[in-house]
Amino acid sequence: MKRLLPFLLIAPLLAEPGDKVYQKGFLSKEDSHKSIELQDDYSFELVLSDPHIHEPVAMAWDGNGALYVVEMRTYMQDADANGEQEATSRISRHEDTTGDGVYDKHTVFIDNLLLPRMVLPLDDRIMVGITNTLDLWTYRDSDGDGVADEKVKVYEGGNRGGNMEHQPSGLVWNLDNSINITYENKAYRFTDEKLEVQKLPRGGGQWGIGMDDAGRNYYSAAGGERPAFYFQQPIKYGALDLRGQEADGFRVVFPIADVPDVQGGPRRVNARGGLNNFTGCAGQGIYRGDRLPADLKGNLIIPEPVGRLIRRAKVTRENGKTVLSNVYPGTEFIRTRDINFRPLWATTSPDGAMMVIDMHRGIIQQGNWTRPKSYLRGVIDKWDIDKNIQKGRIYRLTHPTFKADKQPRMLDESTAELVAHLAHPNGWWRDTAQKLIILRKDRDTVVPALEKLARSHSSELGRLHALWTLEGMSKLTPGLVSFALADQSSLVRTNAVRLSEPFLADGNQDVIETLGSTPALVEDIEMVIQTINSIGASGSDDPKLIAVIDALLERHGENETVGAIKNLQGSVVASRAEARVQKRLGAAFGKAMEHGKV
């Protein structure tokens, strides 16, 4: 069922002879809300808006459910981007004190920032990244007034040049305890209170990073018109895309806002005057909650701010390959005719729902592309949208069956109490508990409880997070990894292979022999793919592991993903036999040198 109030009854209009009817200025909050069309009895609830937030672009919750909103208050305040580089933006903090789901207590947590772009709540600190620098800072409110009063630089990355739309975003604490960002070929990791850098084979993405329950990330690129990519495997093993990973026609969009303000110009405008292809895709997120209809779980939600729409993509994983398809062929999950609806962030919330940021403004393209005489400048001037600024909305996606979960109080709980949340059906709770345990000073006290959970809990996701929590604490044992390699769950087994990498690198024979003799490795294609990746990543040339690789390639070499990984990691996998020959030749050459024969 669609829900739409006839737009022409509510919009401020200006008729132009011989031309279409244009919306001018802003709709009221009520009318803008009513104009949003949603599928399948879903609806939006407005939980936070201006005047409490202005120009919101990202958000995240701390362990007690306080919401931190990143506000780029100087972004495109006119068509020439005047004043954009002034340090007057902020990160605000919001609480729901009544339990009704609406945020009613508001403070400015950090003020006078230069276009903040990343926020990651840690324990009682939040980590922040801003524009034009790769430095990262943590902020803390030490006196409980909702305003940060302590600031510590945790990473010195130096200046970062380039257009503000093409600088890193993210700061996503991943399942594997890496903290991922876009663009840069690196990730971060907390080890004993120090933020360390991990090199990656490639960077990617633009605004936001999604993550599924298996720890695979979903990147997007507005400039590249790519709604999702690099989601076939963790990017540490290489940036892998497969042919056909998007269903036919997936990039075609179906807006009802017929506004041609697209940077790609007329080629990206349909016959009605609206967007015809993904272009502004940003802030995508996998729904990992437990309070909305079950068929939404695992779907990728992709905001498209240029099209004033949100795509719901079904994520299908078969034979080691992920494919995305539009759940609603020929239409969209969420869309509106309100020209100021600019969705650009979607994420699972602590209450089990999903929250969406609507930046709610006229211009959604940085000034480099809106210069005088440009195509976009002509559209901006004709529609008079440069004056539509300093608003912002956050919506909760809800459903008649929705019943909100309790508010979290994890920052107040003991480390022992946090362990149970690792098996929570909502991914936000699991991720947050894992992060908090790793950051706690008394984390070693819960090692026995984590090991028990990893071995015997009925929830495969609980076992999975217990294993990765131990890994983040440097308390994972080879015995537990060997045990997990035989888990009844393919998801747990596959991650156990990932977790085995340091033990493979160290030549731990118990783990090596267990991996090679695991019955599931014969037919579990997910485990096969991960084993090929992990042996390669370990750098081991143990003959037993080489035999495992050879056997897997012989048995599964025709699998599309296995073939792609073989090509991607040719120096590790496809050329392994040649490398062994070269190694033997090198050794022989060295001995010959010693004996004066060459």
Locations of the language-model features?
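Sec-dependent signal peptide recognition
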Residues: M1-F7
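Hydrophobic h-region of N-terminal signal peptides that target proteins for export
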Residues: F7-A15
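Beta-propeller domains with acidic blade repeats across secreted/periplasmic ectodomains
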Residues: E16-E417, W428, L436-L439
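Short beta-alpha connecting loops at secondary-structure transitions
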Residues: E193, T331, S374-K382, L515-T518, ...
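Structural detector for internal amphipathic alpha-helices that build alpha-solenoid repeat scaffolds
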Residues: D405-P408, R430-D442, L461-K475, L480-A486, ...
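HEAT/HEAT-like alpha-solenoid repeats
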Residues: S414, V446-V447, D510-P519, L545-A551
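Short inter-helical turns and helix N-cap capping residues of alpha-solenoid HEAT/ARM repeat scaffolds
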Residues: P425-N426, S458-S459, Q488-S489, V522-D524, ...
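Alpha-helical repeat scaffolds
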Residues: V548-I549, R580-G586
